[in-house]
């Protein structure tokens, strides 16, 4: 600050005087303030001194009081020390006593723990034994329950077997009666129709085939279709052609739907005009009836020209009108039988038996593909008429002609004894009639050179397709149709050559409900699963429904059925030499059949139904080749075994095991 004052320069003495005067005033004010502070400090110090003196006096007094208190506490301390010593002595004695008692309790506790450990070990052993006993008991209970379940399943299987045997016997009896009535009706129809011999001339082959088909449609309507009857046939019959009696078909489910004709049905059947296809309705038709009913291609009644075709007689018109009125009665009985057959299939369906589907009924009965039949030997001397254009076109695919075919297979015709194939339900009947011949999409003609017949005589049981999901199908009555694919492929089954005892071997195998054995002397009906698609899945009319063959070789077989095989050791026995001679005579009239048209109802039904699954979808299909015209099946060769190039399909499991698996899943 002094340096600052030295550095200050004044411009004039007055400024310097004013400056120092100001500083003097400041120093004087500071001195006055300092004096006031000093006086105040002195006064506060005096007051503080007085307070300290008072406090010192109070502290002296308090110190005296504390000394007296210390003396009193010392006395009390001595007193409590004596008391403490006495209590300590008492505590020591008590502690020693408690220690002795605690030692005693510890020893007792150790003994108790040892005893408890022994008890626990014994308890563990007992519990272990109890668990072992409980486990053994549960095991025995499970075995007992399993044995009861197996016993129950076996009892159910036995009950189902008894029911199936009863139903099978009943259906066979009904079938036998129906066949007898059909035979009577066929005889009456053969006698009822008498064709006038007028207007005899050389007939046109195209018209002959059309006339034959129209008659076949009429007969199919009479027997199977609930639709309106066809127009009375104006044409004549040609070389009769039908289907041979299938040896295993008598045990299949198809025949179970043939109703037992009531008296009204008999009366109506006596008035129905005869057509060549009616000769296929009976197995007991004699050769005289066949010759009288069908005639021969060379007879004057069959050699009319198109211009000389006689019109339907008034008596025949009356018969058709009567048939139109009374036809529903027979179908009522038919549907009753079909309902009972469905009930039987539903019972079998509850057991979840694996069913092998029939994908195309054309491969089961040869519908619309080829027709084979055995006829009476009276038609062995007949000659086939000239083939028309359609038959020739169909026969060109197989490198032969209808004339050559008729020469190779004489004696086959529609008038041969066969079976009636009935559809299931009214909605599945195929409308037939002469009007259906104008429709396109015709199946193959039955005049193919690969056409073969393995049926023997009309008094044998009829074969069915292998794998038909019929609860009444037995292992000894499998279809011989599947054997035709092996003939087309030119192969011979190595496991069945010369096997005469196929029936006996097949029934010795364990069978599922689809293979329940039945007596071989009676017929076996087929399930509706077979003949149900017969009306809907094939583009054929009534003629194709009757064209059922035991071993029809179909080159265009459905893909879903070409892999099917007949179980080894099953099927009808091989043909004898006499049977072959009968086949050779029965194929003369084969070339007289014409193409079968497709009706509109068939196309609708076929569109509604999808293709059926094949049980051999992953298997290579055997190549189907047309058999040579002159080839014949050897006498020792079976006709019911299919040839496979891969592993054959597995045999269905027994129903008891399947039912057991279904219960386990539930």
Curated annotation (Swiss-Prot):
It comes from Cryptococcus neoformans var. neoformans serotype D (strain B-3501A) (Filobasidiella neoformans). Keywords: Coiled coil, Cytoplasm, Cytoskeleton, Microtubule, Transport. Residues 251-274, 400-410, 587-599, 614-638 have a biased composition (Polar residues). Residues 14-195 form a coiled coil. Residues 275-287, 372-383, 449-465, 473-485, 536-554 have a biased composition (Low complexity). PANTHER family: NUCLEAR DISTRIBUTION PROTEIN NUDE HOMOLOG (PTHR10921:SF1), NUCLEAR DISTRIBUTION PROTEIN NUDE HOMOLOG 1 (PTHR10921). Residues 40-64, 220-310, 369-388, 397-666 are annotated as: Disordered. It holds the Pfam family NUDE_C. One of its GO terms (molecular function) is microtubule binding. GO terms for cellular component: cytoplasm; kinesin complex; kinetochore; microtubule. Belongs to the nudE family. Self-associates. Interacts with PAC1. GO terms for biological process: centrosome localization; chromosome segregation; establishment of chromosome localization; establishment of mitotic spindle orientation; microtubule nucleation; vesicle transport along microtubule. It is found in: Cytoplasm, Cytoskeleton. It comes from the Eukaryota. This is Nuclear distribution protein nudE homolog 1. Required for nuclear migration.
């Amino acid at each position: 600050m002094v340096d600052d004052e030295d550095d200050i320069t004044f411009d004039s003495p007055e400024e310097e005087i004013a400056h120092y005067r100001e500083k003097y005033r400041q120093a004087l004010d500071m001195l006055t303030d300092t004096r006031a502070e000093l006086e105040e400090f002195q006064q506060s110090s005096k007051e503080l001194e007085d307070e300290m003196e008072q406090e010192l006096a109070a502290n002296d007094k308090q110190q005296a009081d504390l000394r007296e208190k210390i003396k009193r506490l010392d006395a009390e301390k001595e007193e409590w020390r004596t008391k403490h010593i006495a209590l300590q002595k008492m505590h020591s004695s008590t502690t020693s006593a408690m220690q002795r008692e605690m030692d005693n309790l510890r020893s007792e506790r150790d003994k108790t723990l040892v005893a408890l450990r022994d008890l626990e070990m014994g308890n563990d052993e007992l519990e272990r034994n109890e668990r072992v006993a409980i486990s053994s008991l549960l095991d025995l209970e499970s075995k007992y329950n399993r044995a009861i379940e197996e016993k129950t399943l076996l009892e159910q299987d036995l009950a189902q077997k008894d029911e199936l045997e009863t139903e099978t016997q009943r259906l066979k009896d009904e079938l036998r009666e129906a066949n007898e009535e059909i035979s009577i009706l066929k005889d009456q129809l053969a006698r009822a129709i008498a064709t006038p011999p007028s207007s005899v001339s050389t007939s046109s082959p195209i018209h002959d085939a059309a006339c034959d088909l129209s008659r076949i449609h009429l007969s199919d309507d009479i027997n199977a279709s609930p639709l309106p009857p066809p127009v009375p046939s104006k044409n004549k019959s040609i070389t009769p052609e039908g289907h041979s009696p299938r040896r295993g078909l008598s045990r299949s489910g198809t025949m179970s739907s043939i109703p037992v004709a009531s008296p009204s049905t008999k009366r109506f059947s006596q008035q129905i005009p005869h057509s060549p296809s009616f000769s296929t309705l009976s197995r007991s038709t004699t050769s005289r009836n066949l010759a009288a009913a069908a005639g021969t291609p060379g007879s004057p009644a069959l050699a009319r020209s198109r211009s000389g075709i006689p019109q339907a007689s008034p008596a025949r018109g009356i018969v058709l009108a009567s048939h139109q009125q009374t036809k529903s009665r027979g179908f009522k009985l038919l549907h009753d039988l079909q309902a009972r057959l469905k009930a039987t299939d539903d019972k079998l369906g509850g057991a979840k038996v694996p069913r092998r589907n029939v994908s195309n009924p054309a491969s089961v009965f040869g519908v619309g593909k080829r027709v084979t039949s055995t006829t009476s030997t009276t038609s062995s001397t007949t000659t086939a008429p000239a083939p028309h254009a359609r038959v020739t076109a169909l026969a060109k695919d197989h490198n032969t002609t209808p004339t050559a075919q008729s020469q190779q297979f004489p004696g086959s015709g529609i008038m041969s004894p066969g079976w009636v194939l009935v559809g299931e339900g009214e909605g599945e009947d195929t409308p037939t009639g002469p009007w259906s011949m104008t429709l396109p999409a015709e199946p193959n003609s039955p005049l193919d050179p690969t056409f073969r017949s393995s049926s023997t005589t009309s008094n044998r049981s009829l074969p069915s397709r292998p794998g038909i999901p019929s609860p009444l199908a037995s292992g000894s009555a499998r279809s011989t149709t599947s054997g035709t694919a092996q003939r087309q492929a030119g192969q011979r089954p190595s496991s069945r050559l010369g096997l005469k005892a196929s029936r006996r071997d097949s029934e010795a195998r364990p069978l599922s409900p689809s293979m329940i054995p039945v007596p071989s002397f009676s017929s076996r009906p087929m399930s509706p699963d077979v003949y149900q698609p017969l009306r809907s899945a094939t583009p054929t009319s009534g003629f194709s429904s009757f064209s059922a063959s035991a071993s029809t070789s179909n080159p265009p077989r459905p893909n879903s059925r070409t892999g099917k095989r007949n179980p080894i050791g099953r099927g009808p026995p091989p043909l004898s030499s006499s049977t072959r001679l009968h086949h050779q005579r029965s194929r003369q009239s084969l070339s007289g059949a014409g193409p079968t048209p497709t009706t509109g109802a068939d196309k609708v039904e076929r569109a509604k139904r999808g293709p059926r699954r094949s049980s051999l979808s992953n298997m290579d299909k055997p190549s189907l080749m047309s058999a040579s015209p002159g080839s014949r099946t050897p006498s020792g060769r079976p006709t019911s075994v299919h040839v496979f190039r891969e592993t054959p399909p597995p045999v269905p499991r027994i129903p008891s095991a399947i039912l057991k698996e279904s219960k386990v899943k539930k």
